[in-house]
Amino acid sequence: MRHALTLFPLLLVPVLVYNLIAIFGGGGSDAAVSPALSSLDSSLIRMPMISGVRWEFSVGDGILFLGFVMLFIEVIKATSTRSTAIINHAASMFVLMFCVFEFLLFKSFATSEFFMLTMLCFLDVFAGAMVTIVSARRDVVVGDGFTG
């Protein structure tokens, strides 16, 4: 089970949640506005604050929070130098390309929330590659230290 989780790009979870909302969520009649916006803007939590204002946590905020949690786990997973980590990086690259494709071509995905998810996928690919290179580099000893 752990091996399968290492292969699976976790940022696919919030992307799929967004896709489900964009496909099955309602939409406004305004053609200039993304149909997913009405579902993303609906409140999950409303809480009065000490300052007197009301804080709202929307569905879009929840998806972004899930994305940040998944990105954190992905960066931790990137410290592995096994071949499964390389497969995970390749899968993360496909998730990034999928997100860019959706963002550019479909109006339900032209939202700030989905753009931020796409940027999280970009950070996953970039940071994952950097962390893997650094952790692999520390495992490789370069010749100058062993002169006798």
Where do the language-model regions lie?
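Alpha-helical transmembrane segments and their membrane-interface exit regions
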Residues: M119-G128
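Terminal transmembrane helical module of multi-pass membrane proteins
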Residues: G128-G148
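Membrane-helix boundary connector in multi-pass membrane proteins
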Residues: V100-M116
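C-terminal ends of transmembrane helices
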Residues: L71-S83
